[in-house]
């Protein structure tokens, strides 16, 4: 397992900041906290580290400016609040960073910007250019146009996608939670704090609670989801409290936080994109034999597919689901949904007879696939990743 190291030894850091840290329900923007945060960012940049910020707070800030009532907002109310709040949020970041002569660059992303390959590459190029000229990208979901059906849903997973997109080696999630516990500490006095997480296992996933406040959409569940995306690409992750001023300095000085170790063998950029897809177009449900084959680094053949769900086209990302109902892999499917259903459970030699054309022998080729769950020991998986990535 890669050991934890000081922040100053990382090359590129993505910092996600929760709404509750930036915005007070009554007072609005927490200017003093933001100024202190920007001072921390300036300190990292002085060490030659690239810094990207995924900043929540647009809806919360707009809600404060518009004096909207407490409770859940309708979609159009959230979008209006985002439209008002995003301007104020961008201005606040720009003003605070400019105190240290740092330029801020605003980037608003929608789900398609990371899920569609061409737009993904374009967004990555824009972010990399901002970093090249020394600016700090301030990134948020474009809540003014995103709907409940086509959105990230929280900035934890957005931050993880940004980290993988830009090749960051550390993702820091700042919120009102100081890390991962074995159970919600406010409900269980015997809950144990976990300082180091070597691997996100099913047991770790089960520990994730549902803590979320009115000002934010995220909780520990989404942070663990973010960790799975980030660590699979070789990026370490830290969950830490941002309640104190200068939270990055606090982490550096030993404040309590949970550190998630990166995968020992980062996958290729293309496989990173596949693994991080937030909304697979469909699902392939497979049998135990297929699970064993995939764990050995082999392709998914039609014979191992028990059923097909969803509407997808050839080349779309699909989730591969094991007999227990848990996702074990993701990949680019070789057939559209209708043809996949027709050949599911059949031998590859029968494909041409069934479909009328000689398709690929594999439903999902191993070169187009990334494992998203544990099969076998970690050392065995790392050897396979090194062979097939």
UniProtKB/Swiss-Prot annotation:
Its Gene Ontology biological processes?
A: L-proline biosynthetic process
Under the heading InterPro entries, the entry gives:
AceGlu_kinase-like_sf (IPR036393), Asp/Glu/Uridylate_kinase (IPR001048), G5K_ProB (IPR041739), Glu/AcGlu_kinase (IPR001057), Glu_5kinase (IPR011529), Glu_5kinase/COase_Synthase (IPR005715), Glutamate_5-kinase_CS (IPR019797), PUA (IPR002478)
Its Enzyme Commission number(s) read: 2.7.2.11
Q: Superkingdom of the source?
A: Bacteria
CDD domains in the cross-refs: AAK_G5K_ProB, PUA_G5K
Instruction: Identify the residues that bind ATP.
Output: 16, 175-176
Q: What SMART domains does this protein's entry cite?
A: PUA (SM00359)
Tell me the keywords, alphabetical order.
Amino-acid biosynthesis, ATP-binding, Cytoplasm, Kinase, Nucleotide-binding, Proline biosynthesis, Transferase
> What molecular function terms (GO) are annotated for this protein?
ATP binding; glutamate 5-kinase activity; RNA binding
Per the record, the pathway is: Amino-acid biosynthesis; L-proline biosynthesis; L-glutamate 5-semialdehyde from L-glutamate: step 1/2
Q: Where's the PUA domain? A: 281-358
- Where would you say this protein principally sits, based on its record? cytoplasm
The record's HAMAP family line, in alphabetical order, gives:
ProB
Give the protein name, as stated in the record: Glutamate 5-kinase
Tell me which species this is from: Rhizobium johnstonii (strain DSM 114642 / LMG 32736 / 3841) (Rhizobium leguminosarum bv. viciae)
